[in-house]
Amino acid sequence: MTIHDCLKFAEKSLRESGIESFEYDAQELLSYCLNIPRLNLLINKNLEVNQDCYKRFIQLSELRATRVPLQHITNHSDFYGLDLYIDKNVLIPRFETELLCEKAIEIINNKELFVLDLCTGSGCIAIAIAKHCPNAKVTAIDISYDAIKIAEENAKRNSVNIK
């Protein structure tokens, strides 16, 4: 089965399941399974997909068809230029939250301020502020131990120092 065939199969299945972003989701899942950038799928659409990868791709597509969020399947979210690990223990960062970060970064700028991110979850807000406002001292807290571990991992992943 080629990359093109895999994508068409998953797109049809996801579309029939009511997934509005069926094309994007199919591409994300296949690039995740193949461990290649999404753009490479389009460039290499006639490349054969090995049987193990195909089986995994079908499993993940079926999971997505049941409305499991894409970010929970791939454990990944892009947020404000950051690479974040995401799982069921934290909320998926939303575009509206990027707007909040943009405004906070604009206000903080290069000032030496203390910033507290309550209920940090994945740490996306704290990490974005720490990344773009190096003079700020950022602290992130959450009641969930699992969320704190994810936020710590995301801070390391994005090379920022957060307390």
Over which residues does each language-model region extend?
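N-terminal auxiliary segments of SAM/dcSAM-dependent transferases
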Residues: M1-T74
